[in-house]
Amino acid sequence: MTWNGRFRLHPLALLLTAMIAGTAVAADDTQTDGKDDDVLTVHKTAEQELKQQPGVSIITAEDIAKNPPVNDLSDIIRKMPGVNLTGNSANGSRGNNRQIDIRGMGPENTLILIDGVPVSSRNSVRYSWKGERDTRGDSNWVPAEMVERIEVLRGPAAARYGSGAAGGVINIHTKRPTQDWHGSLSLFTNQPENSKEGDTKRTNFSLSGPLAGDALTMRLYGNLNKTDADAADINQAQNGSYAAGREGVRNKDINALVSWKMTPSQILDFSYGYSRQGNIYAGDTQYSNGNISPGGLVDSLYGSETNRLYRQSYGLTHNGFWEWGDSKLAFNYEKTNNTRLKEGSTGRVEGMINSDEYSTSRLENYHASAEANIPLDRWIEQTVTLGAEWNHEKLDDSASMSATNASGVIIGDMSGNPADRSSKNSATTAALYFEDNIQPWEGTFLIPGLRFDHHSEFGGNFSPSFNFSQDLGEGFKLKAGIARVFKAPNLYQSSEGYLLGTRGNGCPSGINNGVGCYLLGNTNLDAEVSVNKELGLEFAADGYAAGVTWFRNDYKNKIVSGTELIGTASDDRNILQWENGGKALVEGLEASLTIPVVSDVLDWRTNATYMLESKDKKTGNPLSIIPKYTINSMLDYQITDKFSTELNWTLYGRQKPREFVESRMEIDSPMSTTEIGAYSVVGLNLNYAFTKDVSVKGGVSNLFDKKIYRENDGASTYNEPGRAYYAGVTMGF
């Protein structure tokens, strides 16, 4: 349901109108929930009700404390139903750069939010011919100790968030300011038993309290974190080269939030964050062929910092609670400077560092939003949500846009001379959305929704949705949802200045005329679209809980490197462009079970995911490589009020590589048949609180030392680290 007319939304005018209307009718008697964090809840909105749908999981601060991530929040997020870690394609490149994948839709269809605001630093990293980025993703900007909760939204419930949420949404909520002065200092270390695996050290602090009574409060945190790279030879040499192990990372973060309670019914938040994230190079090249690096450059860089991201964020948010409902107005700015060593962009050296010179890609995002929740009960009990969003993103990446040098060649309407191609691209999206949380009678909730987005390049897109929940009695509930979701083209795919090339082997398998290919950006792409459906049955009574959910995503228009010729360059090479592909299907089952073995003492929680189907209907290959099934099981034992332990077990099913050739090189060289067989990982976590302000933790991950090594034969493999020991302490006041 895409529309390409010239209609333009003016969201800033909408925001100003909402602000004027809201401030005119402030209520003095708004009720609070009595919590220190000043989060006020007036009415149950559609957004709140959607978080009760079967495709939603909540990770609490207590969950994180009991099962602490080693370095990245993805360590614990991956244990939710429907979630895995993988690359954005099935071709096996960048095997250890695994990001959050939800329901098999790939990391590029997972939208990351921090306090409800989109985070997009990973989009400053070049997008490769095969659809990968050399990035760790956006799940490592908040230290684990500073997280209040994480919401994992899968399927139709994520549609309200717009572009990029076709798989789902990860919403990371940081801790709010408190009414009394509190502070903490946390230390954490993870020490692998295998000396070839990188260890981790992390320290962070927080300070929170009133600056002027309860009218002005603040929260400040800082974080230092270092995870070393795996040894250069952790994996066996194949084809004359090593597949790199896991890259190391250094994080430095500082974040501040000041909250001003202007009146009992109005709160204004000011936020600022600065992060520096640098890598510790482990030798990875896009195609694991560092042995052909000129002068041995790749080998010489092991252990060095070859890329670093500087991320800054500014935010201003107004929350109002009125006689007619509540409102939220927000403006956020995010700037990412991505500084890295220059790399190749053609053929087998694409993505390989080829210079000792650094270049910087800059990505800026401006995001404004307004939302009002209005309860109505004249004829039927309901809460209507009206909202508007505006987002402007602009990219300046001179290195990636000029890396392919074809001086003197005319490629369609574009010059092959880098100096003639622009390094910049930008896009603006404006949106209006409507939702209604309707309770026609006791036990029934209906949530219709409609979102309209207008993109400066591809035009308009309608995203309707409908979710419902029906109480069946005796503890059973039936829940279902359907939504049309979309993803806009990224700024590399749609940039006229972004040129990639290959001398022949990288051309699509259907092109066999013996010459090379150029791949151009395309300003006429359509949005990717997926119709997501789910149906779930849940049971909850006396501490017991169980549920099973079927989901299906019918995906089309996925943007891929082109296979259709659009012309011939002046040097006789074929001209391709990024294009909208055909259809794909993702289908599966999710299940969960909670058993209170001993009430308030011993709980057993299990969730499982089984993939029925994941394939591109044109190529026959999966969208991404994930296990056929995944089971996560946790036994939580509260031994005393101060002492608790958790035993966790994860079983990953077989992971098969893609089977069908996509490039000419794969015709001449047989594709890898290497697959990762089913395996399990067991962990033990211990937590002890000496006082309410001093606690310690420790444990063992991968107790039985099951290791997986990455292979260098083109398969989608990765390193699963072996047994490791961790310890941590938190001191507060």
Describe each PLM feature range.
Residues 74-121:
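Extracytoplasmic beta-strand/coil segments of soluble accessory domains associated
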Residues 122-125, 556, 561, 651-663, ...:
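C-terminal beta-signal and adjacent terminal beta-strands/loops
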Residues 186, 439-445, 550-555, 566-661, ...:
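Gram-negative outer-membrane beta-barrel transporters
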Residues 178-301, 557:
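Periplasmic-side early beta-strands and strand-to-turn transitions of outer-membrane beta-barrels
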Residues 118-154:
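Short acidic/polar hinge/loop motifs at secondary-structure boundaries
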Residues 26-66, 107, 115:
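Short, acidic, small-residue-rich periplasmic hinge/interaction motif at the N-terminus
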Residues 355, 359, 365-374, 421, ...:
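Outer membrane beta-barrel strand-and-loop segments of large Gram-negative receptors
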Residues 73-76, 98-101, 113, 137-140, ...:
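N-terminal periplasmic accessory domains that precede
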